[in-house]
C-alpha cells in the first residue's frame, strides 16, 4: 500500500510538472533598402539552406514562416529594412549548437556585411510552455524588455541563461 501511494505520488508529480521549450527572436536591420536590394543577394541566396539546416537540427521544434516557407514576409515594424526570425527549440543546447557549431555561424560572423547594428540587443531567449508558440508581439516585447532592462527570466541571452521554470 505504501509503495502504491509512493508510485502514485511520483506519477502525479510527473503529470503536474509543466514542460518548457526555448523561444528565440532575432531582429536585424538590413544595410539594403529591403530584402531585394542587391547588397542582400548573397544572404538571401542562403536562406533556404540555413532554414532547412535549422528544421533538420536536433531540438528544433518550430519557426515563424508564411505559406511559402518564407519568414522575411513578416514585418511587425512596418519597416522594409527590418527582418525577424522567431523559432522554438527543445533546449538551450540545441539552439546554441545550431547557432555556433554549424555553417550557420558563418552568417553570424558575417552579419556586418548585410546588417546594421540593432539596439543594445538583437536577439532574446525565453522559456515557453510545451506546445505553445510565440506571437510576433510577444517576441518583440521580450526583445524590448531585454534591451531596456537587461537579462532576467523574462528575456535573456546566451551570456546570461536562465534555467527552465
At which residue positions do the language-model features occur?
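Short, hydrophobic/aromatic alpha-helical segments in well-folded domains
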Residues: 46-50, 84, 94, 107-110
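Tryptophan-centric aromatic hotspots in well-structured domains and transmembrane helices
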Residues: 62, 88-89, 114-115
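Short S/T/G/P-rich N-terminal loop/turn motif that feeds into the first structured element of a domain
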Residues: 2-82, 121-165
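Helix-adjacent hinge/juxtasegments
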Residues: 75-100
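An amphipathic, aromatic/His-enriched active-site/gating alpha helix that lines ligand/cofactor pockets
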Residues: 92-120
Amino acid at each position: 500500500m505504501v509503495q502504491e501511494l509512493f508510485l502514485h505520488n511520483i506519477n502525479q508529480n510527473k503529470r503536474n510538472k509543466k514542460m518548457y521549450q526555448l523561444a528565440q527572436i532575432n531582429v536585424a536591420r538590413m544595410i539594403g533598402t529591403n530584402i531585394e536590394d542587391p547588397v542582400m543577394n548573397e544572404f538571401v541566396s542562403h536562406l533556404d539552406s540555413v532554414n532547412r539546416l535549422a528544421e533538420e537540427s536536433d531540438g528544433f521544434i518550430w519557426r515563424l514562416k508564411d505559406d511559402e516557407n518564407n519568414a522575411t514576409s513578416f514585418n511587425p515594424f512596418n519597416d522594409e529594412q527590418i527582418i525577424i526570425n522567431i523559432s522554438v527549440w527543445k533546449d538551450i543546447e540545441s539552439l546554441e549548437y545550431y547557432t555556433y557549431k554549424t555553417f550557420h555561424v558563418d552568417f553570424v560572423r558575417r552579419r556586418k556585411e548585410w546588417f546594421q547594428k540593432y539596439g543594445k540587443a538583437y536577439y532574446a531567449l525565453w522559456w515557453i510552455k510545451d506546445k505553445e508558440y510565440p506571437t510576433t508581439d510577444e517576441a518583440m516585447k521580450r526583445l524590448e524588455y531585454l534591451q531596456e532592462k537587461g537579462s532576467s527570466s523574462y528575456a535573456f541571452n546566451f551570456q546570461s541563461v536562465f534555467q527552465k521554470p
